[in-house]
């Protein structure tokens, strides 16, 4: 893993976008994208740039089960408001939270990924080491599937909802096996509350107990941190 440490998340987000631009200059056509507060500075850098994304395809990691695309807490809504409405892409794929059947939706999404191999995958990391909604215990060979959210993830996401009771209990998530097929991976982490997970991901053993540790098995991963998220690393 190539670890890059920045003073703040704004600088880190700009650097992540620089890597995406380099990839696009070298022919990248498919971006794997993430939601949540972590990639927002990267999306701001993308929106404020003069880069044209109209020939690019995006594939998002996950979506809450049960939320409509126009629900302001859905990940489709997040992507539209933070990026797609401001920088149009050729195609944008996000799991359908209102799909009638989980098996049908996960099969559809796995085909989307197979038909559009991801050149650059952007990830965040949860406090418990999850990537996407691949919680501790997730198999490393999994594809897209419907997953239950752990209580710690529900607690972490409750701040975005009116109450904890409103937080969805399930999500569709790209699996770790699918993530590892990406040609290049950028993992962003900011804040002291991510420091333990970052240390385990980089310096700990490869274990299903820390889903992000699977990235040690990938040949091209750039970990982009602010100083707080890097604060517990032995080597800086």
Curated annotation (Swiss-Prot):
The active site is at residues 62, 128, 130, 135. GO terms for biological process: carbohydrate metabolic process; glucosamine catabolic process; N-acetylglucosamine catabolic process; N-acetylneuraminate catabolic process. InterPro entries: Glc/Gal-6P_isomerase (IPR006148), Glucosamine6P_isomerase (IPR004547), Glucosamine6P_isomerase_CS (IPR018321), NagB/RpiA_transferase-like (IPR037171). GO terms for molecular function: glucosamine-6-phosphate deaminase activity; identical protein binding. The keyword Protein transport does not apply. Its EC number is 3.5.99.6. Pathway: Amino-sugar metabolism; N-acetylneuraminate degradation; D-fructose 6-phosphate from N-acetylneuraminate: step 5/5. Keywords: Carbohydrate metabolism, Hydrolase. It is an enzyme of class 3 (hydrolase). GO terms for cellular component: cytoplasm. Pfam families: Glucosamine_iso. It catalyses: alpha-D-glucosamine 6-phosphate + H2O = beta-D-fructose 6-phosphate + NH4(+). HAMAP family: GlcN6P_deamin (MF_01241). Belongs to the glucosamine/galactosamine-6-phosphate isomerase family. NagB subfamily. Catalyzes the reversible isomerization-deamination of glucosamine 6-phosphate (GlcN6P) to form fructose 6-phosphate (Fru6P) and ammonium ion. This is Glucosamine-6-phosphate deaminase. It comes from Lacticaseibacillus paracasei (strain ATCC 334 / BCRC 17002 / CCUG 31169 / CIP 107868 / KCTC 3260 / NRRL B-441).
């Amino acid at each position: 893993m190539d670890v890059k440490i920045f003073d703040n998340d704004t600088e880190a987000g700009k650097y992540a976008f620089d890597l995406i631009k380099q990839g696009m200059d070298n022919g990248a056509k498919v971006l794997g994208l993430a939601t949540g507060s972590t990639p927002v500075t990267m999306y701001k850098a993308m929106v404020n740039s003069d880069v044209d994304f109209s020939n690019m395809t995006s594939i998002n990691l996950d979506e809450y089960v049960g939320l409509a695309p126009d629900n302001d807490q859905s990940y489709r809504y997040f992507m539209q408001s933070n990026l797609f409405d401001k920088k149009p892409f050729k195609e944008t794929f996000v799991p359908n939270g209102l799909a009638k059947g989980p098996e049908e939706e996960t099969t559809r999404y796995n085909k989307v990924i197979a038909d559009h191999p991801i050149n650059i995958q952007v990830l965040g990391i949860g406090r418990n080491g999850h990537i996407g909604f691949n919680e501790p215990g997730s198999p490393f060979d999994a594809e897209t599937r419907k997953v239950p959210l752990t209580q710690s993830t529900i607690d972490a996401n409750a701040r975005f909802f009116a109450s904890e009771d409103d937080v969805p209990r399930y999500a569709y998530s790209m699996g770790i096996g699918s993530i590892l097929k990406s040609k290049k991976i950028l993992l962003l982490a900011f804040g002291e509350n991510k420091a333990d997970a970052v240390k385990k991901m980089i310096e700990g053993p490869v274990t299903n107990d820390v889903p992000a540790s699977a990235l040690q098995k990938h040949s091209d991963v750039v970990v982009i941190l602010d100083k707080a998220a890097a604060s517990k690393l032995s080597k800086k």
